[in-house]
Amino acid sequence: ELYLISPLTEPERFLNKEYFLTAQQRDIERQILKKIWAERTGAYWFTGLPGTGKTLLLYDIAMKLSGKQRVCMIHCGESKKDWKRLHERLRRVEYLPDSEIGAKCGLEEYSAVLVDEAHLLEPGARELLAGISTRRPVIFSGDCEDVISPDELGESAEMVWKSVPGVQTFRMTNRIRTNAELSVFIQNMMRLTRGKGRRMYPHVSAGYGNDEEEAEKLLKGYLALGYRYFEENAGSSEDVERLVVLLDERYFYDETGYLRSGNRSVRRLFHRLNQAKEELAFVVKKNEEVYSVILGLLQAM
């Protein structure tokens, strides 16, 4: 349990140091800090699937760097209310939302800059931070998005940072927070490939609605069982015990096995699915192809 904490949602436990880093987290931290102490500059990128402890590692590094110098933590995406809770208690780290990144935002004043959810950075912000990394250390943490179609991603942040001269990259592989069963199902669903090991998914379910009315009834049924549902464009990054998502006729699988959508919303869907901690449900509306794929995965045994 002491590996599971999130600095954003459990700030008191983080500040009281009621947590441990895994051996992998400690090794990545050691390599990054060793190079920072020696060179005082450089770009560092670590990535992993949701639930591998990236944010905890990033904050632990921030705590070590902020002992004797000013550091800035940049948060990307819609989790502003989460990190503000920690900001009220952790004064030695200064905060900046990604929306305020610009030539006059004062990042040059800090001895180090850290970026959480870096896969959400806009191209202009990436370029500015890449330039800053030639003069002081910039550490990026972002989700691995390998299972998402390149056509849905466009130019991924990971590919951009790998092209930065001298960038040091790390891949986190040990899932800590995420339910392994749900994580494997999500990966298999996002891209269909032969040869993946079959397994049971007792905490994943699906229902089919032939029309709007049937889908609405199924959705209400899941809500009555304690599942949470978020509108497609809702900005919440909150992890939930039980999650239900709606898949409509926009979704399809392309010839390479990637899940695709008519409006390039698969990336958002991927990150939404990974908010489920214990149970995951799908309501599929007027889309027999996608429903049959999900059933095939669930009935593979």
Describe each model-derived feature in a short phrase:
Residues 11-22, 29-52, 56-85, 90-93, ...:
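Conserved helicase motor core of SF1/SF2 NTP-dependent helicases
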Residues 1-6:
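Interdomain "pre-motor" coupling segment immediately N-terminal to P-loop NTPase/helicase cores
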